[in-house]
């Protein structure tokens, strides 16, 4: 991979760099925050080839492959380059050929263009896969212009879905998420719009992302929620405290975004790393000069397990997530074929109960320092919807 980003090198001590998480403006960073994910780097001598993904998982009543593929960066990388469209189609189709049937998109990705790329790629086998999209950010329905704030009025949700269906070249969306909770709109009203769309056959299941706990309960009481999509990885274990237990209580599946810790868990970041201008990780305190040396202990732990299990660090990080609950389905994203194949190989990494207990204990002993997102992005997480009057 090319380490250059618009002439500004991002150096990493001899380690092949993973895709940069770029965002040219604050609004773009916020809008994209629901799907920050990186491709896997082959950093040990494990093969990047993969057989078909073994096993299926249930998100509520929705059956999917044990891993998914996030397609967020397939229209425009964070280095601002435009990936080869035919190559993106090839990656998606190869993933399907290897048994991956769960593809994650959103209207905010692109905006709009990622949905078009996914729709083009899956057209030959649309009814054999599960596709997701998301609404909620203030995206112009026609131009895709990204504006500040959120919008989840029922009429707007329905209009957004019509656009999604056209771009995805389909007559239904298997799983539709509210990308972030709009604090001005009762979640009961949002659920009502989804009910109408389900009655029309345009949406089959629904979910929420980064919502408040009370909102999740209210939403599920109004219309059963299939899945929650939140950030979750070895680097950010916050959902373990309340969100995952609530999902277990309610029978809701869990889909971790950024399952590789914005690339950190692959070994792509070390003490010598210098982020390019605009890379959101450059303003994340987890990777500041003060906190990074402490947090690198986590990477060393993952690398040690990679050697022990004869896998790549990416596979260890993903397999660890899948070992936490049988209804957790990570969605690592990539624009590189080899990285996609490496990622799906995580399905073949198994931990014994003793191993997972040992690894969890070691992880707990490492206290990650710093906040997971910049404050202006984090402000959209854990939000409660307005009460229904």
What is the predicted function of each stretch?
Residues 1-15:
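N-terminal secretory signal peptides
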Residues 14-19, 29-47:
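N-terminal twin-arginine translocation
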Residues 64-68, 102, 128-132, 172-175, ...:
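Structural preference for beta-strand elements that scaffold enzyme active sites
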Residues 36-68, 81:
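C-terminal segment of N-terminal export signals and the immediately downstream linker at the start
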Residues 105-120:
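Glycine-rich, proline-tolerant flexible connector loops at the mouths of alpha/beta enzymes
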Residues 82-95, 153-166, 216:
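Short, acidic/polar
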Residues 182-361, 366, 380-386:
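Beta/alpha (TIM)-barrel catalytic core signal, keyed to glycine-rich beta->alpha loops juxtaposed to Asp/Glu
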């Amino acid at each position: 991979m090319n380490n250059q980003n618009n002439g500004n090198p991002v150096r990493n001590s001899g380690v092949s760099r993973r895709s940069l998480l770029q965002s040219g403006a604050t609004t773009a960073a916020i809008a994209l925050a629901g799907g920050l994910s990186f491709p896997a780097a082959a950093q040990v001598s494990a093969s990047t080839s993969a057989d078909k993904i073994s096993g299926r998982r249930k998100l509520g009543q929705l059956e999917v492959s044990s891993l998914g593929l996030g397609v967020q960066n397939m229209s425009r990388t964070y280095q601002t380059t435009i990936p080869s469209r035919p190559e993106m189609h090839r990656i998606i189709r190869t993933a399907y050929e290897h048994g991956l049937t769960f593809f994650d998109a959103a209207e905010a990705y692109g905006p709009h263009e990622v949905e078009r790329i996914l729709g083009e790629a899956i057209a030959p086998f649309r009814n054999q896969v599960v596709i997701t999209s998301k609404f909620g950010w203030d995206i112009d329905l026609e131009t895709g212009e990204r504006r500040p704030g959120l919008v989840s009025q029922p009429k707007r949700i329905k209009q957004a879905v019509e656009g999604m269906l056209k771009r995805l070249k389909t007559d239904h969306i298997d799983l539709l998420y509210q990308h972030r909770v709009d604090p001005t709109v009762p979640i009961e009203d949002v659920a009502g719009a989804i009910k109408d769309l389900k009655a029309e056959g345009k949406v089959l299941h629904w979910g929420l992302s980064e919502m408040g706990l009370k909102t999740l309960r209210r939403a599920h009481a109004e219309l059963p929620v299939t899945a929650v999509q939140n950030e979750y990885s070895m680097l950010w274990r916050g959902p373990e405290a309340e969100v995952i237990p609530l999902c277990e209580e309610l029978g809701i599946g869990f889909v971790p975004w950024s399952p590789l810790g914005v690339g950190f868990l692959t070994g792509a970041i070390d003490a010598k790393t210098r982020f390019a201008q605009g890379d959101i990780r450059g303003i994340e305190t987890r990777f500041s000069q003060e906190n990074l040396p402490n947090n690198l202990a986590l990477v060393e732990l993952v690398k040690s397990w990679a050697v022990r299990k004869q896998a790549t660090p990416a596979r260890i990080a993903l397999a660890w997530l899948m070992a936490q609950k049988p209804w957790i389905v990570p969605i690592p994203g990539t624009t590189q074929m080899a990285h996609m194949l490496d990622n799906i190989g995580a399905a073949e990494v198994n931990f014994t109960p003793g191993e997972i207990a040992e690894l969890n204990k070691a992880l707990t002993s490492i206290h990650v320092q710093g906040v997971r997102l910049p404050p202006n992005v984090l402000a959209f997480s854990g939000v409660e919807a307005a009460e229904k009057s």
